[in-house]
C-alpha cells in the first residue's frame, strides 16, 4: 500500500441505501464494466495525487469535480472545490492548491466522466487570460446547466444536493482553520536585499501551512502567537465586542474613534488614536484633541525592527488614561453616541484620519478605542455634528477611491480599491524573518480569500497592522479594500493582492443585511447593488448563515464560568487561586515592555479557568498576589477561545476593573454559598472519634478544639504554647517561631560567622530571602479523643489572619503603640484558651494499616481553618484579611 493518507472515491455505486449517491439514471452514465471503480487520493510529500484505475494525475487540480450535482448556488463550484482543495504544505517547494490560485475553475459534466478517464486542466495551476477563461466557462456552464435541468427533478439528486450543501457550508465556514492558527516561518531560499516590505513579501511566499494530520504532531509552542501579537489580537477582539452595538439590524456601531497611523522611516507602524474626527474640520478641538489623545495612548502595533517607534510613543500623561475612568462613566453616554464605522489602519505623514464601517457583534477592530474623552469637552455643537456619519471622512473616501474589479487589477505599479465579498476569513499568524538585518523578528500576517462579480477569487495578504483587520471580517461580509497592490509570488507562481501602509478596510457587514443607501456617499449604488446581486445568485447558501447579534454594553451580565460563550464581554465574581508571571512573554504597552500575567481562578473547587491580565490590568499583579485566595469582582472581561487548547479563556480589556470583596459583602456571601454547595459533595464531615474509628484516608471536616501548638526551633529546641501559656510568654516567643528562609523553596537559611545568610544552593541563581512562620504540630481535642495535625507555614499565617511574619514589630497606626505582634499573640492566646470555642478544621488524613486493619501509621495535615464554627464557612474559603493586604480583619 502507498504510504500516507488515502481518500477512496467510489464511482458508479448503487443508489440504495446511501443518501448521497446519485440516481440510477445518473449512475448509468458511468461504465457498467467496473461498477465500483475507485479514484484514490494520495497525500504525498509534495502534493495531492489522484489515481483513477491505471491513470495517475499529477495534481488534484487535474481531476475535475462534477458540478452538476451541486445545488444551484454551487454551480460555479467555488465552495465545492474550495472545500475539497485544502491547502497542504509540507516542504518549501510545495505549491498552494488551486483554491488559492487566481480564478482557477474546475468544472466538468458528469456525463464526461467515463470509466478509467477523467478530464483535467493540465499540470499544476493554470493562469488563463480573462477572455479565454470567460469563453471556456460559458461553454462549460451551458453544458452543466443542461445536465442540471435533467437531474434536478430526481429526488436522489436533491438529497445529494442537500447533504452537499450542508457539507460545503461547514467547509466554507471552517476552511483553512487548521492552517490559520499555525505559526509560520520563512523559507531558506535566497532573496535580494532591499526594502523591508519586499523582504516580508518574499518571506510570506515561502510560508508553510501544514495539514491537520501533520499539525497534530507539531508542538503547541510552534503554533502560538507571540505575546505581542496575542495582546493586539485580544485588544482587537475586545474592541470589536465593545463596538458591536447598534440597531436591530446590527449594522450601526457607536462612534468611538478614528485611527491615525504614522509611517515610520523603516516601515514600522504605530497606532495613534484621536477622539472622533467628526468635530469641525480644522477647528481647535480637533487639533488639540488629536495632540492630546495621541500622546495618551500610543500602542505600538508590531514593529519588532524599529526601536525608535517605542521612544516616539513613550510620552505618556499618566493622569489621563482610560483605565482610570470608571465603568459607569465609561458607558454612561452610550445611547447618545452616534453610529460610526469601525476602523482599521491608515498611516500617513499628514495624520489623515479615516474610518470604516463594522457590521455587528462579531466584527472586530484593530485600533484601540476611546469611549469617553479624558476631559469631557463634547459640547452641544460637537454632539450635533457627531449624530451623523463623518462627512469629511466619507467624502474623502468617495473622492479618492475608484473601485476596480478584481479582473482589472493587472498592473503592479498601481494601487487598487476593490469591493469584494469574503469567502475565507483567517486568523492572524506570524512569520519569522530568518535572514537579513531583521533576522529573528516576527511579522504579523493574515490572508483572506475574496471574490467579486467578475467571478474571480483572489487571495488578499494583509501585513503588519493591517493583519489585525482580518479579525473584523467573517464569511459572507462585504468589504471595501483600498490601496491594495498586485504582487506576483514567484515562489508559487501566483498573483495576490496585498496591503500597503495606506490600506483601509471598510466592513459593510454581512451581504444579507447590507443597506446600500447608507454607503451611497462612499460607494456607488450601482456597484454595490451589482455585487449584492451576484452574491445572492451565485452564493445564495450564505443567506442561511445566522445573523450576528450585537451585545449592548448596558446588558453585560455576571456569568458562571461553566456557561461562558466566546467573543463576548462579561462580568464575573472569582476566587484567585494562583498568580503567574511569564517573564519571557513580553509585549509593548504604552512605550514599555510588559510581562504577561496569568491568573488561575475558580468558581467551584477544582474547576480552574485562566484569566490573562493585559495592558493596564497587569498593574493589579501586586494586589492580587498579596490577596491571593480572596474573592474578587472583575468587570468587562473578554471571553476568547484558545486556538491551541480549544478552551475558553478570560482576558482583561482597556475597560476592565477589579475589586476585592470583604467577607461580609453580599456578593462574597452569595459566592461562598454557591461555592459551598458545589464542594459539599467532595468533603466528608465527621467528628474526631468517628474518623479515628473509621480510619478514613482523604479530606474530612472535623470540629475540635486546639489544645496545643508546638514549634520546632533551631538547635533542637521546641516551643510549646498551650492554655497555660500567658500572653506575655507567647509574645516573647514570637521571634523564635519565625525564621529567614529561601523565598523560592522556603528552606531555612543558615548564617556564617559574620551573621550573613548563606545562599540556598539548590535554588541558585535565585537568591531571594523571606521571613516565614515555623511549621507547627497542632494538638486537637474532641471529648476524650485527641490527635496531632501538621500545620505548615502558610497555614500558620492564615490562622493569624494573614499577619505577615516580617511585620510583627510594626505598629498598626503611627499614633498607637500596638504592634502586629501583640495582635498575633492575642490571637494565639484566645485560640488556646480553655474557654475557646471549637474550630472547624479541614484535614487531609492518611492511614497506613496492616493486614488486621490496625493503623501502623497515621498522618494528618491541616488544609484549611475557620476559628468560629458558628459562622458561615465553606471549604477552601477560610477567614481572610479583609482588603488590608495582611492586616488583621475586623475581628
From Swiss-Prot:
Q: Does the keyword Metal-binding apply?
A: no
Pfam families membership? OB_SHLD2_2nd, SHLD2_C, SHLD2_OB1
Top-level taxonomic group? Eukaryota
State the gene name recorded for this protein: Shld2
Record protein name field:
Shieldin complex subunit 2
State its role: Component of the shieldin complex, which plays an important role in repair of DNA double-stranded breaks (DSBs). During G1 and S phase of the cell cycle, the complex functions downstream of TP53BP1 to promote non-homologous end joining (NHEJ) and suppress DNA end resection. Mediates various NHEJ-dependent processes including immunoglobulin class-switch recombination, and fusion of unprotected telomeres.
Provide the species name: Mus musculus (Mouse)
Compositionally biased residues, Basic and acidic residues: 192-222
Q: What's this protein's family per the entry?
A: Belongs to the SHLD2 family.
Q: How does it assemble?
A: Component of the shieldin complex, consisting of SHLD1, SHLD2, SHLD3 and MAD2L2/REV7. Within the complex, SHLD2 forms a scaffold which interacts with a SHLD3-MAD2L2 subcomplex via its N-terminus, and with SHLD1 via its C-terminus. Interacts with TP53BP1. Interacts with RIF1. Interacts with ASTE1.
* Segments for region (Mediates interaction with SHLD1): 695-866
Membrane-traversing stretches:
none
GO (cellular component) term, any one: site of double-strand break
Region described as Interaction with ASTE1: spans on this chain:
1-542
Q: Which GO terms describe its biological process?
A: DNA repair; negative regulation of double-strand break repair via homologous recombination; positive regulation of double-strand break repair via nonhomologous end joining; positive regulation of isotype switching; somatic diversification of immunoglobulins involved in immune response; telomere maintenance in response to DNA damage
Location of region: Disordered: 184-222, 260-294, 333-357
Please give the PANTHER family that the UniProt record associates with this protein. SHIELDIN COMPLEX SUBUNIT 2
